[in-house]
């Protein structure tokens, strides 16, 4: 493997878990537990652990560059994507290498994990911090678009949204196989998307060990047919105790299902004592327009979406990417 002085740059190997977590907890001055770490990097539905490590003979793991892997659909092809998160370098090693250890790790990560070969991710993306310009300059990261949010104030006592009597929205601990069929029916609408099937929803929401989400499904009362699903949570992001429409899978032209699911998410937000509901949709997606017609406004955020891809370019993704807040690890 390539070396930088006393450092070895290498991919993750089984058994590294505790050492990697120790490095991240030290760098971020936090306490993330091992179960959460394994959920994030090991137990994902893509079955890939996308991590590049810097190891010192005496100090152990001193740097991490990695991504959460997930199955994705791109131009009709099933591929793997990765959301880059939790990069870190211990402070005493930041200056190692010509451009610093972050750049050394990032280059090794992209060389190993970005591509169209077996075990690689076709694209990786992230919501970068203030230091992103180094990644743009040295690692080729490109800006896809800003992450604007849709929001609606929900003051206490506001009347519930009227919905169709033909539909029923309920909460479930996890989605069943019907959601696989729903995604398959809708897949043609999406140029690029994470594969929102049962395995992904189970991993991203139902099985996350340190946070609870509300999973909602909309069905026809008479037939029981699944029309759409949504995911809701409350978190201290944007402002304290904010409600979030985290995920959404429903036909773009099914306004009855849109209204029914949205009404249920709004009621869940109010029941949690929150007076603000936020969500994210692609600005070119018709759902972005529909929510504005249903009373939502648009606001900018500090976040923006960046990308490295082995195929196409940032413009392709900018125009075709179906994303929600659930594509990130913010909530």
What positions do the PLM features span?
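Conserved N-terminal entry element of GNAT/NAT acetyltransferase domains
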Residues: 1-15, 156-175
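Secondary-structure boundary elements
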Residues: 112-120, 220-224
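Active-site/acyl-donor-binding loops of N-acyltransferases
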Residues: 4, 121-166, 222, 231-255, ...
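Conserved acetyl-CoA-binding loop-helix of GNAT-fold acetyltransferases
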Residues: 89, 94-113, 255-267
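Hydrophobic, Leu/Ile/Phe/Ala-enriched alpha-helical segments that form helix-helix packing faces
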Residues: 24-28, 109-117, 136, 186, ...
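Core nucleotidyl-transferase/polymerase catalytic module
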Residues: 2, 44-54, 62-66, 82-89, ...
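A conserved beta-strand-loop-helix scaffold within acyl/acetyltransferase catalytic domains
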Residues: 7-87, 129-130, 173-251
């Amino acid at each position: 493997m390539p070396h930088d002085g006393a450092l070895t740059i290498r991919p993750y190997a089984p058994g590294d878990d505790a050492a990697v977590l120790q490095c991240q907890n030290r760098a971020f001055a936090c306490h993330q537990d091992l179960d959460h770490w394994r959920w994030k990097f090991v137990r994902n539905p893509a079955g890939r652990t996308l991590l590049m490590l810097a190891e010192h003979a005496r100090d152990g793991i001193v740097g991490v560059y990695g991504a959460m892997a997930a199955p994705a659909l791109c131009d009709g092809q099933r591929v793997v994507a990765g959301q880059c998160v939790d990069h870190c370098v211990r402070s005493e090693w930041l200056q190692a290498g010509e451009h610093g250890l972050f750049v050394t790790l990032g280059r090794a990560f992209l060389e190993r994990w970005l591509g169209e070969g077996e075990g690689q991710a076709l694209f990786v993306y992230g919501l970068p911090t203030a230091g992103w310009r180094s990644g743009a300059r040295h690692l080729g990261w490109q800006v896809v678009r800003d992450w604007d949010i849709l929001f609606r104030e929900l003051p206490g006592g506001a009347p519930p949204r009227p919905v169709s009597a033909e539909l029923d929205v309920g909460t479930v601990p996890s989605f069943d196989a019907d959601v696989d069929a729903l995604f398959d029916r809708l897949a043609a609408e999406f140029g690029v998307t994470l594969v929102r099937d049962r395995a992904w929803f189970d991993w991203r929401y139902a099985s996350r060990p340190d946070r609870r989400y509300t999973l909602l499904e909309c069905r026809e009362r008479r037939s029981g047919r699944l029309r759409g699903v949504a995911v809701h949570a409350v978190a201290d992001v944007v402002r304290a105790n904010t409600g979030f429409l985290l995920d959404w899978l429903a036909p773009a032209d099914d306004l009855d299902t849109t209204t029914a699911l949205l009404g249920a998410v709004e009621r869940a937000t109010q029941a949690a004592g929150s007076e603000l509901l936020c969500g994210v949709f692609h600005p070119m997606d018709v759902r972005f327009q529909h929510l504005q017609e249903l009373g939502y406004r648009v606001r900018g955020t500090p976040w923006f979406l960046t990308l490295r891809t082995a195929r196409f370019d940032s413009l392709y993704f900018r125009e075709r990417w179906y994303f929600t807040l659930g594509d990130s690890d913010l909530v």
